[in-house]
Amino acid sequence: MANVLQTEQIAPASRIRAATLGAALTVLVLAGGLIASFMVSSATFQALDGRVPGSLTFTLAVLVFSASTLFSSALWGLGMAHLAQVPASWRMAWAGILGFVPITLLLIFGLQAAEPIVFRTNLPLHRVFTVLFVPSAALIAGTSSLALGWALGWGRAAPALALRVGLTAALAFLAVNLGMEALGWQVGGPGAAERATMLTVLFVSNLGAALAGGAMLGMTLAQRH
C-alpha cells in the first residue's frame, strides 16, 4: 500500500478522456442525482399533500429523497471504480454514499445554523455567500474523494487525493462566483430577488466545482499506480 500519491504518465488523449468521464459522472450522476432527488421529493410531497395525513406525506417525501440520493451516490462510486480500473463492488458503492451524503446533510444543517452568526459580522451579503459556500464545496469534494481513496486501499495517499480534489473544486467555485459577480450577478445586489441571483449563482458555481473536481478526480484515478 503506497503512502504517497504517485501517478503514472498516460497519453494525453487518455488523460482528457478520464477527466471528461470524471466530470460527467460527477455532474450528471452525483450533483444531478441530488437535484433530481429534490425535484422528485418535492413532486411527491405536492402530489400527496391534502390527500394523506401531513406527517405521512412528509415521511414519504423524505424516503423518496433519501432513496434517490443513496442510489445516485452509489452509482457514482461504481462509476469511479471503472475509472480507477478496479472491479465494481459494494465497497465502492458504499464509499460513494458515505463520502457524499453525510457531509452534504451536515453542511445543509450547519450552514443554516451558521447563517445568523455570519450575518452579525456585518459583511456584505455577497461576501457572506462566498465565505460560506467556497469551503463547503471543498469539504464535499474532499470528503467524497477521501472515501473513494480509502475504499481503493490508498492509505495515506487518500488524504492527498482529497486535498487535491477539494482545492480544485473550491477554486472553481470561487472563480465562477467572482466571474458572475463581475458580470452583474451579485448576491444581494440590485434586482437580485427578481432574478433569483443567489440560487442562480449557487447552481452555476456548484456546476463549475463539480466539473473541475470531477475532472481532477477522474484524471488522478486513471493515472494512479
What kind of region is each of these model predictions?
Residues 2-225:
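Juxtamembrane/disordered regions of integral membrane proteins
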